[in-house]
Structure formats: C-alpha cells, structure tokens
Design a protein with these regions (language model features):
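Short amphipathic alpha-helical interaction segments
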Residues: 115-130
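Non-catalytic, well-ordered alpha-helical scaffold segments
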Residues: 87-94, 123, 149, 153
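A short, conserved structural fragment
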Residues: 130-140
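Minor-groove-contacting beta-hairpin "wing" of winged helix-turn-helix DNA-binding domains
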Residues: 141-146
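C-terminal scaffold of the Radical SAM
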Residues: 1-114
Length: 161
C-alpha cells in the first residue's frame, strides 16, 4: 500500500521526503525538518516541550500542563532534564532516520558535540542496523534503506539505550 501511495503522489508532483510526509519540491515542512535533524526548539505555553543544545550538553524542558500552574510559574519550566550520553544515540537516530535522504554525518557532531566514535555504543549499533539491511552509512550521511523505512520502529529500536 505504501508503495502505491508513494507512486501515485509522485505522479502528482509530491515526493516522499520523510517516512510519513510528501511535498512538492521546496515545500517540505521546515518545522518538522528541524525535529528530524535534531534541531533545537523552545517550548512556549502550558504543557509545551523544548530542547536546547549547549556546547557540552542537551537540555529537555517541559512546562506545567495545567494553565493555572503555568501562569503561577510565570512560564518557567516545570521540569528540566539533561539528555544522557547513552540516550543521545537513540534520540538522534529516532528522528534522523525518518528522513528518506537521511541526515549528514556531520550533523551528529554539530548537534551532540562529540565524534561518532566517542559515543559508547553508536558504532556498534550502526553496524547492527547495517548488517540487518535497515540502514546504510554513506561517506556523507546516515540513511534508512527502503526496508528500514518500512520497518522504522525496528530500526529505531536498535538504538535504544
């Protein structure tokens, strides 16, 4: 079914750029592309989530869900947590592997502040995903294979901490 949908949409000028998104050339959703490339975002408003990267850490924020509690806190985060090193590989790949074209390998260092080989498990898990035919590591990018996109949950699970 997915193949048929992709073919029909392509005939209409809509190309698949993400596991569940299609767009005309140059019309991809920049908002979602920011998430898929592990970009930062501010959580503004009751119940909002945010992600902020610093040179040596990544911080997740959650605002109070109840509007009264949010207003009482004057918009301050109700919860902040640092993304641990073992979670980084999963969080990065959870999003990046959704993109049909994959993500530039340099984006890993740019967003995490570490080389691929510095992560305790990433190279091992990349190898596992490749050996199962679910992804490829090209000279310039990580990319899910067609099978990897079909079995995206299985591919993402390989990177669980």
């Amino acid at each position: 079914m997915q193949t048929l949908v992709t073919e029909r949409l392509a005939e209409s000028g809509l190309k698949r750029y993400e596991v569940s998104a299609y767009a005309a050339a140059g019309q991809q959703c920049r908002h979602n592309l920011n998430y898929w490339t592990f970009g930062d975002y501010l959580g503004i408003g009751a119940g909002a989530h945010g992600k902020i990267s610093f040179a040596n850490r990544i911080l997740r924020t959650v605002k109070a869900r109840n509007p009264d509690a949010y207003l009482t806190a004057k918009g301050a985060a109700a919860k902040q947590s640092e993304v641990g090193i073992h979670d980084l590989g999963f969080e990065f790949m959870l999003n990046a592997l959704r993109l049909v074209e994959g993500v530039p390998i340099g984006r890993w260092a740019q967003t995490t502040g570490m080389a691929i080989g510095e992560h305790p498990l990433l190279l091992e898990r990349l190898g596992s995903a490749q050996s199962k035919g679910l992804m490829v590591r090209r000279p310039d990018r990580f990319q899910a294979t067609a099978r990897g996109l079909e079995l995206l949950n299985d591919l993402q699970a390989i990177f669980l901490p």
